[in-house]
Amino acid sequence: MKKILIFIDWYTPAFKAGGPISSIYNLTHFLEEEINFYIVTSNKDLNSKKELHGIKTNAWQQINKSKVIYLDERSQNQKMLRKIINEIKPDKIYL
């Protein structure tokens, strides 16, 4: 199966950013039987200082059939993003 790596500022259970969160969630849910999705996002909601409830920070976890990593601010850097890309070896990257 093809691998797609998605970088998005906020992802479920975040909700304050609205449409983009829903769009990526629906895209991955609709195509999860055909594509392996890996999502890199932040561990806070839009304009929030609190970590999202119910997530693990800086660790991959399963949301439906997608793998998601919620990064804290310290881990949102070029070195970490390069490490993730090299680890996943995606067929495509969605920015």
Question: For each of these PLM feature ranges, what is it?
Answer:
Residues 20, 77-78:
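Conserved donor sugar-nucleotide recognition element shared by glycan-biosynthetic enzymes
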Residues 1-53:
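N-terminal subdomain of nucleotide-sugar transferases
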Residues 47-76:
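Conserved nucleotide-sugar phosphate-binding/catalytic loop shared by glycosyltransferases and other
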Residues 5-8, 60-62, 86-88:
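A short alpha-helix capping/helix-coil boundary motif
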Residues 28-33, 61-66, 91-94:
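Glycine-rich loops and low-complexity Gly/Arg-rich segments
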Residues 26, 80-83:
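Alpha-helical elements of Rossmann-like donor-binding domains used by nucleotide-donor carbohydrate transfer enzymes
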Residues 71-74, 80-81, 95:
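Charged, low-complexity C-terminal accessory regions
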Residues 83-95:
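Short N-terminal targeting/anchoring amphipathic segment
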